[in-house]
Design a protein with these regions (language model features):
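Short beta-strand elements of extracellular/lumenal beta-sandwich folds
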Residues: 17-37
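Acidic, glycine-rich catalytic/binding loops that coordinate metals and/or anionic ligands
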Residues: 106, 202, 207-210, 230-305
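Surface-exposed, glycine-biased beta-strand/turn segments
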Residues: 61-177, 275-305
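Short acidic, flexible loop segments centered on an aromatic residue
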Residues: 24, 35-54
Length: 305
């Protein structure tokens, strides 16, 4: 029996593990183990089938949840003859059709009662690694002091934490690296919080956080250089024209033009250069109740189907 595996960046990063077993009927049952704490979009493409009946669902293109996901089965034409199949795979963080609430009210990610001057960062005109482009690039900069606390603006599950770099603590605003926390929301959008002081994260991947919960400390040097909160919310958007992968990635990030709650102003989009005061009113903090849906959690066992 000959079985071959094609090119796959899944194995190098170990975020998604694809495996298959042969069942009692001789079928090859494929599954994917998602080690992340949010949904991923998985695509599997087969280039070779020898003595294998192609499954009508192929190429496989679907969301996989955290934990174990059963995918599909391949059946040999003649169980007594060798089989061969070659496939490639790719994945993207997020949902195929993200049900994002672009009118959601976010807290300012700073201490209640604290005042800050807000700026919109300019678009760097380049996409993040693995993306074809970014739409509506929108990142807020909040002037802070070193050691100030960063708070979660919305309920969600921590998906990534990076706080190992010390460049920003030496006063570098754009050091090429950025300490940050990423949090997944119930509508499959993601919040990015930076720039954290080295080793200052107060949360870890997989942790459920509530609105207004401390998640890290602001970096920067003793003179305040590099001391700012960079806050953005984005979600996955698929490009059907590029979905085959023949001309590049078929996914890109769309940024949400945030509606934030501030004291004396209420809900609204923040103006570049204006000064605002943070406030955590209960109505905003509790707008996502338990009954309205839970953020995605990683399962310890069982299967997602």
């Amino acid at each position: 029996m000959l079985i071959f595996l094609g090119n796959s960046r899944l194995f190098s990063q170990r975020i998604i593990e694809i495996s298959y077993v042969q069942d009692s009927r001789g079928a090859y049952v494929f599954s994917a183990l998602n080690h992340a704490f949010c949904n991923y979009i998985l695509e599997l493409r087969f280039t070779t089938f020898d003595n294998i009946k192609p499954d009508p669902s192929l190429p496989y293109y679907a969301e996989i949840k955290p934990g174990l996901n059963k995918l599909f089965s391949l059946y040999p034409v003649n169980p007594n003859d060798p089989v061969k199949f070659i496939y490639s795979s790719s994945f993207h963080k997020g949902c195929i059709h993200s049900p994002v609430d672009t009118n959601f009210t976010y807290l300012l990610p700073i201490s209640p009662g604290k005042q800050t001057q807000v700026y919109e960062m300019s678009n760097p005109d380049k996409a993040m690694a693995g993306e074809s482009r970014q739409d509506n690039w929108y990142v807020l900069r909040l002037k802070m002091k070193p050691g100030d606390t960063i708070y979660a603006s919305r309920k969600g599950v921590v998906t990534e934490v990076e706080d190992r770099d010390g460049s920003n603590d030496a006063g570098a605003v754009s050091a090429g690296k950025e300490n940050y926390v990423e949090i997944a929301h119930a509508d499959c959008s993601f919040a990015h919080y930076g720039i954290l002081r080295k080793s200052s994260a107060l949360v870890k991947p997989g942790q459920l956080v509530k609105p207004g919960q401390p998640i890290g400390l602001v970096g920067g040097d003793q003179y305040g250089r590099g001391s700012e909160v960079r806050f953005s919310v984005y979600y996955n958007q698929e490009d059907v024209g590029l979905r085959s992968g023949e001309n590049g990635p078929g996914h890109y990030s769309v940024y949400v033009h945030l509606q934030c709650w501030t004291k004396n102003n209420g809900k609204g989009r923040l103006k570049h250069g204006d000064v605002y005061i943070s406030e955590f009113p209960p109505a905003v903090v509790n707008q996502e109740s338990e009954k309205k849906g839970q953020p995605m959690k990683k399962k310890k066992g069982g299967e997602n189907r």
